[in-house]
Amino acid sequence: MRLLRWIFQRDNQTLTCQVDQQPGAGNYTLSLVPHSDAAAEIAETFNTAWSAFRRHATIATELRRSGWTLAAYTAD
């Protein structure tokens, strides 16, 4: 189940950073997916939602410092 999805943009590049809860497992996955190459997805797994959201916030901060802007977001 998707909990959070932010789409970042820099120049002509687009990147999704999202947090999903794994059904039945109680784990949370944070994924970074470049839209130009979905096969280059990076995923990290966390035991708590708090840890996944904290990591998402850290990545979002670093992306903004690197010139990325938030283009869209959803909280499903």
Which role does the model predict for each range below?
Residues M1-A25:
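N-terminal segment of the canonical double-stranded RNA-binding domain
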Residues V33-H35, F46, I59-T61, A71-Y73:
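Short, charged/polar low-complexity linear motifs in solvent-exposed/disordered segments
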Residues N47-R65:
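A short, charged, amphipathic alpha-helix used as a generic interaction element across diverse proteins
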Residues T14-L15, E62-D76:
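Short, mixed-charge low-complexity intrinsically disordered segments
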Residues T16-I42:
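Short aromatic-glycine-(Arg/Gly/Cys) micro-motifs in beta-strand/loop hairpins
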Residues M1-R5, P34, T69-D76:
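Intrinsically disordered, low-complexity regulatory segments
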